[in-house]
Amino acid sequence: MNNNLLIIAGPTAVGKSDLSVDLAKKLNGEIISVDSMQIYKYMDIGSAKISKEEMGGIPHYLIDFVDPSKEFSVAEFKDLTTEKIKDIQSRGKLPILVGGTGLYINSIICNMNFAESDKDEEYREELEKIANEHGNEYLHEMLKDIDLESYNSIHFNNRKRVIRALETYKLTGKPFSSFKAKNSIYETPYNIYYYVLNMDRAKLYDRINKRVDIMFEKGLLEEVKNLKAMGLTDDMQSMKGIGYKEVLYYLDGKISLEQCIEMIKQGSRNYAKRQLTWFRKDPRAIFIDKDTFASEEDISSKIINDIINS
């Protein structure tokens, strides 16, 4: 059984879904979403979730399965995705990761070791109590004897990180900093083909702006109203996503609808810029400038030829 893994990444609204479905059909593949918003149920419009029709009969995984009131970690994503990759490969098919969440992608192809996966809520509460009674600096000093590297690198006012470092040592007996050091950036068990779609910035930004307008036409306001009625609030992980937090501001009377729409467009454009910056850090990523290809078919052919001839 081969260990090939195809990745189609890129900024929001660049057109990853259509290309990936076409490739899946031609390469006998199945798709695993690597999008930190499309994991949530009931959040279809604001996350630009792919529809059943758009899936074109290709199985898609890790979409629409997490309750938006729940937290979901990168470590959980890694575990689920690793199992799904094995499952797809065991059936003689090609797993294709598709999306724009760089940290999710790196959790799979950088062989990252997550100390984040284990929690001790009781100990966390105990540490919170210590910090409340004695101050953040007192809590920070507790790190000094067990993890000097974290003590030096984590500011004493970053209480959440200090607590995480102390908790990790209690759970594993190892310094929090040692887990970070084991993140081997380019070590992966897979034979990866990693492509990042891109296009002229002005064109991309225009696509982003139009996508936001379409979201409102499709009923983004109603979607967020329903989520709010379900008890979801702006301090929850799911509701911090672009498009959701801004509509909550509008529904709470903090901003006008016009301001809401413009904030979503600006936030999405800024996010696209950050995504591209992230992907450029990995020398294994092959950038595909869509403007230099006559059609999607040509892009698809280029990727297929790369895989066949490698």
Swiss-Prot record:
Annotated keywords: ATP-binding, Magnesium, Nucleotide-binding, Transferase, tRNA processing
Region named Interaction with substrate tRNA: 35-38
GO MF annotation, one: ATP binding
Residues the record lists as binding substrate: T12, A13, V14, G15, K16, S17
Source domain of life: Bacteria
Binding-site residues for ATP, renumbered to this chain: G10, P11, T12, A13, V14, G15, K16, S17
GO biological process: tRNA modification
InterPro entries documented for this protein: Dimethylallyltransferase, IPT, P-loop_NTPase
Major enzyme class: transferase
EC number: 2.5.1.75
Reaction(s) this enzyme catalyzes, per UniProt: adenosine(37) in tRNA + dimethylallyl diphosphate = N(6)-dimethylallyladenosine(37) in tRNA + diphosphate
Keyword ATP-binding: yes
Annotated site residue numbers, Interaction with substrate tRNA: T101, R124
The protein's required cofactors: Mg(2+)
Role played: Catalyzes the transfer of a dimethylallyl group onto the adenine at position 37 in tRNAs that read codons beginning with uridine, leading to the formation of N6-(dimethylallyl)adenosine (i(6)A).
Family: Belongs to the IPP transferase family.
Quaternary structure and interacting proteins, as annotated: Monomer.
NCBIfam families assigned to the protein according to its UniProt record, in alphabetical order: miaA
Protein name, UniProt field: tRNA dimethylallyltransferase
Source taxonomy: Bacteria, Bacillati, Bacillota, Clostridia, Eubacteriales
Gene: miaA
